[in-house]
Amino acid sequence: IYRYMKLEDAIKYYKDAFNDFDSDKAAKLLGKLGLKLNQKISQCSKGMLEQIHMVLALSRSSDVYIFDEPLAAVDPLTRDDIMEMIKSERKKESIVFISTHLISDVESLFDSIIMVKDGKVILHDNVQSLKKENKADLETIFKEKLR
């Protein structure tokens, strides 16, 4: 999306670019986040831009979603809204990849986790069995693996 656009322009742009894009869903989700369709993207904060990109991605019927630090620039309440949106609005049976340093915030979203250090996978496991085996949360496990 381009900064000169309004949100309604971004929705039209995605609708034209992707045949699996649901413009009604995008408008509904933007409204749930308190964003107005006539709002200019240039007037959006970094956190708002994260939300807009999340909505645009989740408004596609995709088998795989990839998000890079989607929670980094948002306040805690918006973070909760985004997490709930990922849970409820993604295509069922889809795969969601999230790269994040906010491990404790996304822990409840996943069935499995891949931890990467220096571009190499250092751990790939089921979240519940990993937590049970280590008797710790994912952030603690991650810190131990990085040492």
Task: Locate predicted features.
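ABC-family P-loop ATPase nucleotide-binding domains
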Residues: 1-52
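Catalytic Walker B motif of ABC-type/P-loop ATPase nucleotide-binding domains
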Residues: 65-69, 74
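Helical segment within the ABC ATPase nucleotide-binding domain
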Residues: 79-92
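Conserved H-loop
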Residues: 93-102
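A short, surface-exposed alpha-helical micro-motif characterized by mixed small hydrophobic
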Residues: 106-108
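ABC ATPase "signature
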Residues: 124-125
